[in-house]
Amino acid sequence: MKKFLLAGLLLLPCLSEAQPRPSLSGDYVEVRTASVFAGACHFNGEVVTTGRDAMMAWNVQSGRWRGISLAGVRAIAVVSSEANLADKALRRSELIIDSGASEAQTGAMVDALKENYGALGKVVSVRRAPVKFEHTGKSYLVSAGEIATLSVEGMPNDECCKMPHQVWYEPLVPLMHRKVGYTKGVQYSGGSVAEGWQRADENSAFYGKFLI
């Protein structure tokens, strides 16, 4: 009996190591420059002509990275490629970290995003700006001064769940409870990765909870 108890105790550390707990968690929303939920004809009309840019936003609600608390830190990434982002072509991205974060938090947030999200491609610049991230019900409103803004609403009656065959893409990052959103508006003023762009009134967003 003692041998079995000893063997069980020795297994506990192994089980703990095999199931690491996420370090960071919070809200996430992204907007693409192509509809992610649409009919087949609409999708085929866009897939080779657009969808080369995206805006991604994180609101960390809890967690630490490299020993630094990132709770309350907000960040935006603007990603650009020469082909539709679904094609896995080379990408460049610009990060915008909330100016309310400390230097240590900024460095840790940049490190966490670069290490966990290959979807960013090559991060060519990091900017600081007052980033706001509002999530109320199924509504998301994110802004970074005059650099970037997005406004997303959940789809009525969760239509994307009822017609999954019309969801043509996956989010750029893994999400829990992923939903498709309606983009009321998104705008990027331009920077190191792309010229300015804007879109509105299309089903081009994903939102949910992120865990890393």
Set out the residue ranges of the language-model regions:
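The N-terminal extracellular segments of secreted preproproteins, especially immediately downstream
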Residues: 13, 33, 40, 159-160
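Hydrophobic h-region of N-terminal signal peptides that target proteins for export
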Residues: 8-17
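N-terminal Sec/ER secretory leader and immediately downstream segment
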Residues: 19-97
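Residue-level detector of bioactive/disordered segments in secreted/extracellular proteins
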Residues: 16, 43, 162-163
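Mature, soluble, non-transmembrane domains
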Residues: 98-210
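Positively charged n-region of N-terminal signal peptides that target proteins for export
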Residues: 1-4
